[in-house]
């Protein structure tokens, strides 16, 4: 569904030509606009898919693994804390915030983020755009991490409900 919606949006946007961008993308040689949805002709004629919250997901997986290894009896407590946005369990939140985090030169957390990014990129690139080219993962979230964070509940990394997601591939903590 995502690929079909993105392709429809690309065709609609294709009505608006972008000659200056097209020249920089090889359109001067081919004479084809980069937004032309019927013909390939520019060097980079792909479609992107914005990926949000990489650090939140990676940090959450690390926090869950840590909790289950160190304090398996608190698994249900974690679920309750997330459901209530940590309102009644600040100690659990502080524990989660103290777990290893992506972007702090900690191998386990950084490898978790890399594995997630690789898997997501593989899934996204398996989809084709309107010209048959693969979609590409785009981890540069232009301020949409603020908007999307508003709609995401509390997460196991200690992030509270409606707080922003991490920007692009930047660490949140």
What are the functions of these language-model segments?
Residues 1-173:
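Acidic, glycine-enriched catalytic cores built around paired aspartates
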């Amino acid at each position: 569904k995502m690929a079909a919606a993105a392709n429809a949006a690309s065709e609609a946007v294709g009505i608006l030509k972008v000659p200056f961008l097209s020249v920089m993308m090889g359109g001067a040689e081919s004479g084809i606009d980069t937004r032309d949805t019927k013909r390939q002709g520019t060097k980079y004629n792909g479609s992107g898919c914005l990926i949000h919250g990489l650090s939140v997901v990676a940090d959450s997986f690390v926090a869950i693994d840590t909790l289950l290894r160190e304090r398996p009896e608190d698994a249900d407590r974690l679920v309750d804390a997330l459901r209530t946005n940590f309102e009644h369990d600040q100690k659990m939140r502080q524990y989660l915030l103290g777990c290893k985090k992506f972007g702090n030169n900690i191998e386990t957390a950084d490898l978790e983020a890399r594995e997630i990014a690789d898997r997501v990129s593989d899934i996204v690139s398996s989809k084709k755009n309107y010209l048959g080219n693969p979609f590409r993962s785009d981890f540069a979230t232009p301020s949409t991490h603020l908007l999307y964070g508003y709609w995401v509940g509390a997460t196991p990394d200690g992030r509270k409900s409606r707080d922003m997601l991490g920007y692009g591939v930047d660490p949140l903590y």
